[in-house]
A protein has these predicted regions:
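Juxtamembrane/interface segments at transmembrane-helix termini
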Residues: 2, 72-80, 131-144, 163-176, ...
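Final/C-terminal transmembrane alpha-helix of multipass membrane proteins
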Residues: 264-293
Length: 308
């Protein structure tokens, strides 16, 4: 007799841990640190591990730790090493890039922005090593490289903001500080300086893809949950014995918007929308100040804004 399980009624089985497919010759062994967590099982797979780091993973974590350590200690020093003030003012604390007087020189005194350069260097190295690790793990498992290229799109935006655009502008001061509210302040000031990013067509595309990603994610998630009582979340069963879940989901969207995605195409749509969010966003940031000084005036000249 078929039973319907969802997040509230599912049964968690704990057996011998699944260690994954065999590794190719020359790869290090996975760390056999495994276990089960009840609450992880409520949200996804209850099994923890096995973990595979390799030298790339270890190096990435090490450089990431150094970056966070530099940022954290500088923030702590800015409140006179007071743990209470650090916690109270955490969202307002920052580690700022060098001032405009230093240009794009890598040789800046630590107290005047050198710490920011060091933290950025270690953080960038950590991110790039993690990307290489994700690429190698995907190749090792015989997977496609979709995750790697999506991650690369996010790295593109990060590099544009922190390195490529400041390099083209000739000043580290064009980059973003480390910090939560200071980062938001930088974003607001950046928009004001360059005549309102709302008139930047690549920014508009980025926002459209961002909202589109949220919409696609909500539509896909809601559809699968709506037909999970018919086994809609079990993709293997849907391929080999379709039952009624796929038909009902497809029919619902044909009724409501005229056509429906397939089990494959919805993921391709979501992937492209997510990738294009950061890709177009990076292009919009890169063009600001280097090619277009004031986006509002540019929009007027091209009949994109009123008053043109």
């Amino acid at each position: 007799m078929a039973r319907y399980y969802n997040i509230f009624t599912q049964v968690q089985l704990q057996t011998a841990p699944e260690m994954g497919v065999p590794l190719p010759p020359g790869d290090e062994e996975r760390y056999r640190l495994t276990g089960y967590n009840y609450w992880f099982g409520k949200l996804g797979q209850a099994q923890i591990g096995p973990i595979y780091l390799g030298w790339l993973g270890v190096a990435s974590l090490l450089f990431g730790f150094l970056a966070i350590e530099i940022i954290g200690l500088n923030m702590l020093a800015s409140v006179n090493w007071s743990p209470i003030a650090f916690v109270r003012e955490f969202f307002w604390l920052s580690l700022d890039p060098p001032g405009p007087e230093w240009g794009f020189s890598p040789f800046v005194p630590l107290a005047q922005g050198g710490w920011w350069i060091l933290a950025g260097f270690f953080l960038t190295l950590s991110i790039l090593l993690w990307w290489v690790r994700s690429y190698r793990r995907a190749k090792s498992l015989g997977m496609g490289l979709h995750v790697c290229w999506a991650f690369a799109s996010a790295i593109w935006l990060y590099l544009v903001i922190g390195f490529i655009r400041p390099f083209l502008m000739g000043s580290w001061s064009e980059s973003v500080p480390f910090g939560i509210f200071p980062h938001l302040d930088w974003t607001n000031n950046f928009s004001l300086i360059h005549g309102n990013l709302f008139y930047n067509p690549f920014h508009a595309l980025s926002i459209a893809f961002l909202y589109g990603s949220a919409l696609l994610f909500a539509m896909h998630g809601a559809t699968i949950l709506a037909v999970s009582r018919y086994g809609g979340e079990r993709e293997i069963e849907q391929i080999t014995d379709r039952g009624t879940a796929s038909e009902r989901a497809g029919l619902f969207w044909r009724w409501t918007m005229g056509f429906n995605a397939t089990m494959e195409s919805i993921h391709r749509w979501a992937w492209w929308f997510a990738v294009l969010t950061t890709l177009t966003g990076g292009i919009g940031i890169l063009l600001s100040g280097t090619v277009v000084e004031n986006w509002y005036l540019w929009a007027q000249q091209h009949q994109y804004a009123p008053g043109g």
